[in-house]
UniProtKB/Swiss-Prot annotation:
Tissue-level expression: Mainly expressed in leaves, stems and seedlings, and, to a lower extent, in fruits, flowers and roots.
Residue stretches in coiled coil: none
Full protein name: Transcription factor PIF1
Modified residues (Phosphothreonine): T10, T197
Knockout mutant characteristics: Plants overaccumulate free protochlorophyllide in the darkness and exhibit photooxidative damage (bleaching) in subsequent light, probably caused by the photosensitizing activity of this tetrapyrrole intermediate.
Entry-linked InterPro entries: bHLH_dom, HLH_DNA-bd_sf, PIF1-like_bHLH, PIF3-like
Effect on the protein upon substituting S465A: Loss of phosphorylation by CK2
Pfam families recorded: HLH
Organism from which the protein derives: Arabidopsis thaliana (Mouse-ear cress)
Record note on what altering T10A does: Loss of phosphorylation by CK2
Length: 478
């Protein structure tokens, strides 16, 4: 692949030369420029400027064919190409066409069409100059076009269209300056650097190239520039998007952290409130329970004191002993009630545990006074009916009856008379045994009718006995 070195210059010093060179063109060729196609090329042939349409790939025949320059490898440079030089007078600028404000991306993105290939001719070499030593050590290192980026302000502010013309002018001016002492290969190598103008990143086309009337650079090596432009746009967008993503992620993490802190604080407050409420309820329940227990114990103590007062001779302090005493006392009371409910004719039975309570029972019933035993038989009616008195029958038939005198007051039992309780059993007639002698101490007081009848019978019996003794004495004497 061979590169053609175009003859162009964009310095302001060569504006007059450009105007003078355009005057040599016929008017027909000038008027037809730009009518058929926007992309035109100006060639220098035999001291004349020739217009060539790049899309149609047509060029005017020339008397002398253009000389081709082989592509120069940066590692190897032929010595034959070092003798070729370009004079300043033979270079004419053709890039002074009016610029258009089109899409900014068109300056960086190109299609790999065959129309991007430019041709150039070198008219003549005037004089041979000494070769210029060019070594690999003196060359600046080629920069990596994949790492350059554009400012984010152009994308954010939408001013890409405004910076397009300025960037294109800067690119043309930086890339089209060729020193008279440099070879085309050296100029190409020096112009193949990435330069930054007015805060914007731009790339210079290596090896020179053709330019259209819009002021846009058409690269000689189209594939490399295409990769460069595409990478620049991709890198710039990828730089913007990660930053936005990082900002969003940071904000999202901050919101999540804030939400988490608020949730944790609320949960802690809720737990504390629940614990405090539960502890308060438990303390209140404990207080109520303690108060009820205290009241219940007080009532029990009062009842035990009252029971201790009711039980006689109860000196127990503990509750169990007091309850035992109360149980025994209730049993004794039950027995007393049974004895009182029985009739007078039925002798109550003596239980084993009644001896200790007998004095208390007598005091409660008014029986604390000793009861004197009667001096007569308790049932005189039955005895009188069973055994009639013989003296009365004998005296009834023998003579007039004598009136029964009243009994001797000294012989009648008087309640006010002092009675000796230490004396033995009452005196009964000889050969008579009392059948109720064993129950006399427990039997209640005798009915009053029995006493009256008993008081009359002994006197009559005693009177009759005295009469019998007198009659018996008289009968023996007479």
């Amino acid at each position: 692949m061979h590169h053609f070195v175009p003859d162009f210059d964009t310095d302001d010093d060569y504006v007059n030369n450009h105007n003078s060179s355009l005057n040599h063109l016929p008017r027909k060729s000038i008027t037809t420029m730009g009518e058929d196609d926007d992309l035109m090329e100006l060639l220098w042939q035999n001291g004349q400027v020739v217009v060539q349409n790049q899309r149609l790939h047509t060029k005017k025949p020339s008397s002398s064919p253009p000389k081709l320059l082989p592509s120069m490898d940066p590692q190897q440079q032929p010595s034959s190409d070092q003798n070729l030089f370009i004079q300043e007078d033979e270079m004419t600028s053709w890039l002074h066409y009016p610029l258009r404000d089109d899409d900014f991306c068109s300056d960086l993105l190109f299609s790999a069409a065959p129309t991007a290939t430019a041709t150039a001719t070198v008219s003549q070499v005037t004089a041979a100059r000494p070769p210029v030593s060019s070594t690999n050590e003196s060359r600046p290192p080629v920069r990596n076009f994949m790492n350059f980026s554009r400012l984010r302000g152009d994308f954010n502010n939408g001013r890409g269209g405004e910076s397009g013309p300025l960037l294109s002018k800067a690119v043309v001016r930086e890339s089209t300056q060729v020193s008279p002492s440099a070879t085309p290969s050296a100029a190409a190598s020096e112009s193949g650097l990435t330069r930054r103008t007015d805060g914007t990143d731009s790339s210079a086309v290596a090896g020179g190239g053709a330019y259209n009337r819009k002021g846009k650079a058409v690269a000689m090596t189209a594939p490399a520039i295409e990769i460069t432009g595409t990478s620049s746009s991709v890198v710039s967008k990828s730089e913007i998007e990660p930053e936005k993503t990082n900002v969003d992620d940071r904000k999202r993490k901050e919101r999540e952290a804030t939400t988490t802190d608020e949730t944790e604080s609320r949960s802690e407050e809720t737990k504390q409130a629940r614990v405090s409420t539960t502890s308060t309820k438990r303390s209140r329940a404990a207080e109520v329970h303690n108060l009820s227990e205290r009241k219940r114990r007080d009532r029990i103590n009062e009842r035990m004191k009252a029971l201790q007062e009711l039980i006689p001779r109860c000196n127990k302090s503990d509750k169990a002993s007091m309850l035992d005493e109360a149980i025994e006392y209730m049993k004794s009371l039950q027995l007393q009630i049974q004895m009182m409910s029985m009739g007078c004719g039925m002798m109550p039975m003596m239980y084993p545990g009644m001896q200790q309570y007998m004095p208390h029972m007598a005091m409660g019933m008014g029986m604390n006074q000793p009861i004197p035993p009667p001096s007569f038989m308790p049932f005189p009616n039955m005895l009188a009916a069973q055994r009639p008195l013989p003296t009365q029958t004998h005296m009834a038939g023998s003579g007039p009856q004598y009136p029964v005198h009243a009994s001797d007051p000294s012989r009648v039992f008087v309640p006010n008379q002092q009675y000796d309780p230490t004396s033995g059993q009452p005196q009964y007639p000889a050969g008579y045994t009392d059948p109720y002698q064993q129950f006399r101490g427990l039997h209640p007081t005798q009915p009053p009718q029995f006493q009256n009848q008993a008081t009359s019978y002994p006197s009559s019996s005693r009177v009759s006995s005295s009469k019998e003794s007198e009659d018996h004495g008289n009968h023996t004497t007479g």
